[in-house]
């Protein structure tokens, strides 16, 4: 049995461009979840630890996606709150074959 761990952070929706070009020109995106602490929580859960995630998401498509994924992988959602009055943050990421992608929050 793994250790019990608590992580605290801000998960975000992530839209990743599926073709190269400026984000104002791209037509197709893939939806994912981002956030440094979220990634740590997911990794620790996959290693067999019991992980709680203290956070707040909005009652919106990104918030629902995040909560659904947390439950799907077995991440403890007992300390995750859904806020009626706020939206979940998100970021846009460009696709590039050279250098770093453009990222907007």
Explain the meaning of each model-derived region:
Residues 10, 35-36, 59, 90:
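Gly/Ser/Thr-rich helix-start
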Residues 32, 39-50, 95:
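Alpha-helix C-terminal capping segments
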